Amino acid sequence: MANIKSNEKRLRQNIKRNLNNKGQKTKLKTNVKNFHKEINLDNLGNVYSQADRLARKGIISTNRARRLKSRNVAVLNKTQVTAVEGK
């Protein structure tokens, strides 16, 4: 790339944004793992809000956020059904 000030600034911005986006995705993965460790509505709410926030910012696609939420709700419903059947 040519040594143009605007290109150098753009490169700095891209690096900073890339690091921020990676951190946000890591937080989402951590929230999903925490949900799977202890399945409850509080953890599901964290996953929902994080996924919606990242989709709104364009860090993940809206379809990916919807898919993630749908799969986690299915896990929650499955555990609730087995808990009721076990009683």
Swiss-Prot record:
Pfam families: Ribosomal_S20p. Keywords: Ribonucleoprotein, Ribosomal protein, RNA-binding, rRNA-binding. One of its GO terms (biological process) is translation. GO terms for molecular function: rRNA binding; structural constituent of ribosome. GO terms for cellular component: ribonucleoprotein complex; ribosome. It comes from the Bacteria. HAMAP family: Ribosomal_bS20. Binds directly to 16S ribosomal RNA. Belongs to the bacterial ribosomal protein bS20 family. This is Small ribosomal subunit protein bS20. The lineage of its organism: Bacteria, Bacillati, Mycoplasmatota, Mycoplasmoidales, Mycoplasmoidaceae.
